[in-house]
UniProtKB/Swiss-Prot annotation:
Known role: Catalyzes the decarboxylation of (R)-methylmalonyl-CoA to propionyl-CoA. Could be part of a pathway that converts succinate to propanoate.
This protein's encoding gene: scpB
Lineage: Bacteria, Pseudomonadati, Pseudomonadota, Gammaproteobacteria, Enterobacterales
EC code: 4.1.1.-
Record-linked Pfam families: ECH_1
GO CC field: cytosol
Protein name (record): Methylmalonyl-CoA decarboxylase
């Protein structure tokens, strides 16, 4: 099949999905995510054993994260259950084949959560990673926070979110976010070699173990009162002047003036 915003190439038992949304810096807009999800669905075939997600070679930006133009104005949850980011992270996590994120360039905001939802992350040494919701006044949701803390740990996630500052690939490797960091000229060969190696293993066993790991990773307890309390806190944020100020400042390309209400 052909797609507008991604390109798909199969190499033996490995499928490579390359982003093709450069004019928007591979932002996670609905049209892009719809194409990506359709490509994954089409690749859920027995002869495909492993998937690689990548930006085009030489990319300065792997993905800019959320498409800010698609975030709702005040009064609506910017990260609801059917948000494109929520949809693609669920699909990656539940997909029955290993998915490797091959990262070249900078990873911003929601795209960081997306790659964290994949099974392995292999990055070029020049890559950087940042979580930026506080630059926009966006109240990240519980599922997204859980996805991040499950793999990166609370203190690292707090630093990433509270500062919104990028970290290097070397530091991301040191704190356990990445599996491997290689020089950019070696990235494609290294990742393909890993994917081909995985593709020769028992696919049914891999599928069930991936699902077991997902279920174990999501095993947590929160009572309904706590959930409603957190949702109320989030609602106060996306109803706030700060949320609207963050959106306006981004679109107007200026520094936001957050006042705390």
């Amino acid at each position: 099949m052909s797609y507008q915003y991604v390109n798909v190439v199969t190499i033996n038992k490995v499928a490579v999905i390359e982003f093709n949304y450069g004019r928007k810096l591979n932002a996670l807009s609905k049209v892009f995510i719809d194409d990506l999800m359709q490509a994954l669905s089409d690749l859920n075939r027995p002869e495909i054993r492993c998937i690689i997600l990548r930006a085009p070679s030489g990319s300065k930006v792997f993905s800019a994260g959320h498409d800010i133009h698609e975030l709702p104005s005040g009064g609506r949850d910017p990260l609801s259950y059917d948000d494109p980011l929520r949809q693609i992270t669920r699909m990656i996590q539940k997909f029955p084949k290993p998915i490797i994120s091959m990262v070249e360039g900078s990873v911003w905001g929601g795209a960081f959560e997306m790659i964290m939802s994949s099974d392995l992350i292999i990055a070029a040494s020049t890559s950087t990673f940042s979580m930026t919701p506080v630059n926009l006044g966006v109240p990240y949701n519980l599922v997204g926070i859980h996805n991040l803390t499950r793999d990166a740990g609370f203190h690292i996630v707090k630093e990433l979110i509270f500062t919104a500052s990028p970290i290097t690939a070397q530091r991301a490797l040191a704190v356990g976010i990445l599996n491997h960091v290689v020089e950019v000229e070696e990235l494609e060969d290294f990742t393909l070699q890993m994917a081909h190696h995985i593709s020769e293993k028992a696919p049914l066993a891999i599928a069930v173990i991936k699902e077991e790991l997902r279920v174990l990773g999501e095993a947590h307890t929160m009572n309904s009162d706590e959930f409603e309390r957190i949702q109320g806190m989030r609602r106060a944020v996306y109803d706030s002047e700060d949320y609207q100020e963050g959106m306006n400042a981004f679109l107007e390309k200026r520094k936001p003036n957050f006042v705390g209400h």
